């Protein structure tokens, strides 16, 4: 089989389900699959079972052409596992804030960094360290994020982690080391050995390759976060920002320099800094009140030029990461008007205000002013929401609902074949 016949398998572990895409040498998808997690989102076995089910459902003749696989994981999902990958309980969600860890965080890492927040992965790691009857044993226990744990299953080797997934755990991408005094802690051995996204880590474990029906030569490539993957899929140009309208609201843009601020992430990608933040609010809050069918029907009744007059803060629960870093910030979901369409409009306006504050926050910290917003994710299918956002932001807002994070990871994986340490794919400018 020639190199041009090989396919890249990209996996997107979203907060609402799994997606995968098979990508050919021309960059186009040959097949895409998606499903909900077969277990609760925080159960790691559900990630593994869901991936195995989707992969084995692909036609065998296509599976035999897969040359590399890369995974984008939901940023901030952290679990404790044994050295051979066995989960020791459920993972802690990205929305889990740990305000009781603030004094310890202050002693470990510099103030204002991504790991200094009570909503960051380092705070969750500290809670995992102290919340089990048997203390964390660094020689027998590991702390891994979602994508890194699943990557370990593919390799039957859980020592690796990918940089972007570990920034809020305390990895300093500029200095290429753990921030503050993290490396001096007795539990530092439980942290992963980090590599850059796009790095080839070796072939699939033989047993995994056999169970999935994949070639034993298939390479496992370090992926990225789901937010970074969807930015690659959206292909932003100069001056563009990318808003991911999924279960949560994620904002990303390119900046000539990294930013310093609570709740803000900085990723080195394609020779630039991809900066941004993720709110706990998003379309997931809408689903607390409406089905997808209701959302579609009620949205048609919204007049974007007539404000609802309500001021809601659509958070799924207490605590926020970005644009406000406050583990005690409470949602505001009422008063609820009689009209369901008006209530939906008010919720969308509340999410729009979170977005406006987010872009404003990034600019205050030193990012260039966004001139245009590209919208991806499920919310990018809603034209009324787009108009509400465009009116609030006072800049063009375009919907790119077909952008696929899984396909972006497939292209990322395919680009790695033949290189020992492949560079991340270039960002395409339009």
What feature does the model see in each segment?
Residues 77, 100-104, 231:
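Pocket-flanking alpha-helical
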Residues 60-95, 112-119, 137, 147, ...:
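Short beta-strand-loop/turn "lid" adjacent to the catalytic site in phosphate-handling enzymes
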Residues 9-10, 106-118, 126-140, 144-145, ...:
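Active-site core segments that coordinate phosphate-bearing ligands/cofactors
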Residues 79-84, 103-106, 254:
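Short, conserved acidic/polar surface loops in the N-terminal third of protein domains
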Residues 94-110:
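Short alpha-helix plus adjacent loop in nuclease-associated cores
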Residues 186-188:
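Intrinsically disordered, low-complexity regions enriched in Pro/Ser/Thr/Gly and acidic residues
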Residues 43, 174, 197-201:
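Short beta-strand to alpha-helix junction loop
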Residues 1-91, 134, 139, 210, ...:
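N-terminal glycine/serine-rich phosphate-binding loop of ATP-dependent small-molecule kinases
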């Amino acid at each position: 089989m020639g190199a041009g016949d090989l396919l890249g398998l990209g996996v997107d572990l979203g907060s609402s389900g799994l997606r995968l895409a098979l990508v050919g040498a021309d960059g186009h998808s040959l097949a895409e699959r998606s499903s909900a997690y077969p277990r609760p989102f925080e159960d790691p076995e559900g990630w593994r079972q869901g991936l195995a089910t989707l992969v084995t459902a692909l036609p065998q003749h296509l599976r035999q052409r897969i040359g590399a696989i890369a995974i984008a994981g939901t940023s901030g999902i952290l679990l404790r596992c044994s050295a051979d990958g066995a989960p020791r309980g459920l993972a802690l969600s990205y929305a889990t804030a740990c305000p009781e860890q603030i004094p310890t965080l202050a002693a470990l890492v510099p103030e204002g960094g991504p790991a200094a927040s009570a909503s960051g992965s380092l705070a969750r790691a500290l809670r995992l360290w102290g919340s089990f009857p048997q203390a964390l044993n660094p020689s027998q226990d590991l702390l891994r994020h979602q994508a890194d744990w699943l990557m370990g299953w593919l390799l039957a080797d859980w020592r690796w982690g990918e940089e972007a997934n570990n920034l809020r755990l305390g990895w300093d991408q500029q200095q290429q080391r753990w921030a503050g005094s993290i490396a001096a802690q007795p539990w530092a051995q439980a942290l992963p050995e980090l590599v850059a996204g796009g790095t080839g880590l070796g072939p699939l474990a033989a047993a995994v390759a056999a169970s999935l029906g994949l070639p034993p030569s298939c390479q496992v490539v370090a992926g990225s976060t789901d937010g970074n993957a969807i930015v690659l899929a959206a292909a932003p140009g100069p001056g563009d920002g990318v808003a991911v309208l999924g279960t949560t609201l994620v904002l990303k843009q390119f900046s000539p320099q990294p930013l310093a601020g609570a709740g803000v992430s900085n990723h080195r990608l394609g020779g630039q800094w991809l900066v941004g933040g993720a709110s706990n609010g998003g379309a997931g809050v809408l689903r607390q009140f409406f089905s997808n069918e209701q959302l579609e029907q009620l949205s048609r009744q919204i007049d974007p030029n007539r404000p609802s007059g309500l001021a809601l803060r659509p958070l799924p629960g207490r605590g926020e990461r970005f644009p406000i870093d406050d583990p005690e910030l409470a949602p505001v979901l009422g008063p609820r008007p009689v009209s369901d369409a008006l209530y939906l409009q008010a919720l969308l306006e509340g999410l729009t205000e979170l977005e406006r504050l987010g872009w404003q926050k990034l600019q205050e910290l030193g990012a260039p002013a966004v001139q245009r917003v590209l919208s991806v994710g499920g919310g990018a299918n809603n034209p009324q929401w787009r108009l509400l956002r465009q009116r609030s932001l006072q800049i063009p807002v375009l919907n790119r609902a077909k952008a696929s994070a899984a396909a972006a990871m497939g292209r990322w994986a395919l680009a790695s074949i033949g290189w020992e340490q492949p560079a991340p794919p270039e960002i395409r400018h339009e």
